[in-house]
Amino acid sequence: MAEDVKAAMPQSILFQNEDRTVALIDVPRSIEEAQLLSSTEIISGVNSRRLVSSKPPDEPFRTPEPRNLIPNPDLAAAIADLTAAASIEQALKVLRDTYAGPWCLPRTLAPAEDVNGRKRKAAPAEEGNGVAERQGAASEPLIPEDSVYLQGTISAERARFLEEAPQFDLIVLDPPWPNRSARRKKDSYSTANNLDEIRETLSLIPIAAHLAPEGLVAIWVTNKPSVVELLTSARGLLSEWGLELIDEWTWLKVTTSGEPILDVNSAWRKPWERILIAKRRGSKRTKLPSQRKVLVSVPDLHSRKPNLRALFEDVFSPGYKGLEVFARNLTAGWWSWGDEALKFQQPEHWV
């Protein structure tokens, strides 16, 4: 029976091909499952609260293209975009050829608001989708089993981390990269003002001292060449941390019918984000079990990304030790660090 449970996929993984290079992930369910420690509970779905989410997009977003487009002078960035686009087209072909199910699971929706921000009744299209009633004043956050959190900035909590934190098999970072469009959005997460500021913050994280000898670091990055260069150049942060790149995953955002939410060939914005995966320099690990994985999801709220715990069980045994830096929710059995670590653990985000 234990073997059956181990072999079964979590409900959040709606599809995964045989070589595990393509995975369709339900973002809210991956975060819901991350609240649980027991693999039996995760697979069965029992005792799982539901996360309040946004309505999944049915149509691609329209974005204006620049009138006077200047060709990208960065050859490496142009090649990276072409490589990502080719991987995405292949992943979508795999899904369309072999998967006939839904592209996301039913969601628990927040109450709709009118243009003045006042709550109104759910629209007919939302009825029956598990529309959540917002709670009043926030009470105690919901803390998953065996999770540890450092609620505060990197500089404020660094001393405690150095004193108390163990070594981790996986360290996930979702840095607040400079992003003007995110800063313009209401209720958006805070971002760094510039790359110098975020580099200074990232340099404070003691990666080398707290990464297990054969551990991995997974870093969410935007598609800006300067962000990737900050990490991967000869004097970049990976070098500073004693790391070297071992793989790169792509997260593609799609509509409920499986169309990319933006034109793949758009010069302005891309429908994907990337995850750079690095190992210790000199590690015995040469590659991951599934190279250049493509994760496909219908997006949720702006700052939410799929929880990666289950996806790295291909690499580490279940129950491995993880840390998420710049976390916005907690994960059972993991450490979480950041000034928004409890953001989505507040009771009003759950039903």
Task: Identify the residue ranges that each predicted region occupies.
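Short helix-terminating capping/connector loops at secondary-structure junctions
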Residues: 164-165, 209-214
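Functionally constrained cores in energy, signaling, and assembly domains
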Residues: 179, 209-210, 218, 274
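Short, basic/hydrophobic alpha-helical segments
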Residues: 200-211
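Conserved beta-strand signature within the Rossmann-like core of class I S-adenosyl-L-methionine
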Residues: 213-222, 247
